[in-house]
Amino acid sequence: MIALDQHLTEHKKDITQQWLEVCTSNGSWLYSAKDQQKLEQKLKDQHELLVTIVAKSLRKEDVEDELNRWSLQCARDRAVHEVTVTQSVGQFNTFRHIMFEWIHKFSEASSQDISIQEFYEWSRILNQNIDEIIEVFTEEYHQVTMIQLNAQKEMINELSAPIMPITDGIGILPLVGEIDTHRARTILESVLEQCSALKLSYLFLDISGVPIVDTMVAYQIFKVIDSTKLLGIETIISGIRPEIAQTVVKLGLDFSNVKTEQSLAKALANKGFKIKEC
């Protein structure tokens, strides 16, 4: 008499195909539409392997490491392809139900008497496996998506502080939008790298587009000026509003040696650049 684990392993392609058909009929899919054809075989291979792992566990083999590796890789794949946790957990539960159906059919078709206790034990092991998959999957998915979000945030922050060279040795840095501690630190690092790469002698820093300049922002601006000075770059600030000036005074920051102008146009004009009106 064929054993349950052997029966499931021999029918892993059928089980996987049934799972795929149920998922697609429910409007659920592992990958985005543009990737379906390319990655369908990978999806099949992945879930045929899962059938094999679960089958091994039903004959009381220790599959914890294999199950963890499978769950981690699955989480990374689905996070990269932007499949939601809700969709994924739903697909795991679909897999659970299909595997249970195959176990139930095997029990009914078996010529041997399968006790209620044995059937219950198979069900318990199956549920335990799927529960462990979901637990490991959701934790890893969260970690991967947080890394992705942080990387995107870093990229956005870097792009939000571009120095525009207007001639050899002269660049403009218009700051726009709210500045928090993280963005301020990124701006400082990005500005120093860009100034060095562009070989600037003068940097026009315009802050008229920053809605709120609090203590932290004012201090970071001062750090930018101080740091660029060490690189031999003269920084001219424009767009300082009265409330910004008050913040600087309250902080006790010494801007006496810093050149400031009311507007960027005036700052450029003082350096010999003529602003043509459209």
From Swiss-Prot:
Family matches, as Pfam families: RsbRD_N (PF14361), STAS (PF01740)
Please summarize what the entry says happens upon disruption of the gene.
Answer: Cells lacking this gene have no visible phenotype is response to salt, ethanol or energy stress. However cells with multiple disruption (RsbRA, RsbRB and RsbRD) have an increased basal level of sigma-B, indicating this protein is a negative regulator of sigma-B.
Taxonomically, the superkingdom here is Bacteria
Q: Does the keyword Cell inner membrane apply?
A: no
**Residues of the signal sequence?**
none
The keyword DNA-binding appears for this protein: no
Provide the STAS domain boundaries: 160-271
| Entries under InterPro entries matching the protein | Bact_StressResp_Reg, RsbRD_N_dom, STAS_dom, STAS_dom_sf
Keywords from the UniProt entry: Phosphoprotein
Q: How is it modified after translation?
A: Phosphorylated by RsbT.
**Sites bearing Phosphothreonine, chain numbering:** T181
Q: Which PROSITE patterns match?
A: STAS
Report the protein's function.
Answer: One of 4 functionally non-identical RsbR paralogs, it functions in the environmental signaling branch of the general stress response.
User: Quaternary structure per UniProt?
Assistant: Probably present in the stressosome with RsbRA, RsbRB, RsbRC and RsbS.
Name assigned to this protein: RsbT co-antagonist protein RsbRD
The organism of origin for this protein: Bacillus subtilis (strain 168)
Q: What is the lineage of its organism?
A: Bacteria, Bacillati, Bacillota, Bacilli, Bacillales
Q: Gene behind this chain?
A: rsbRD
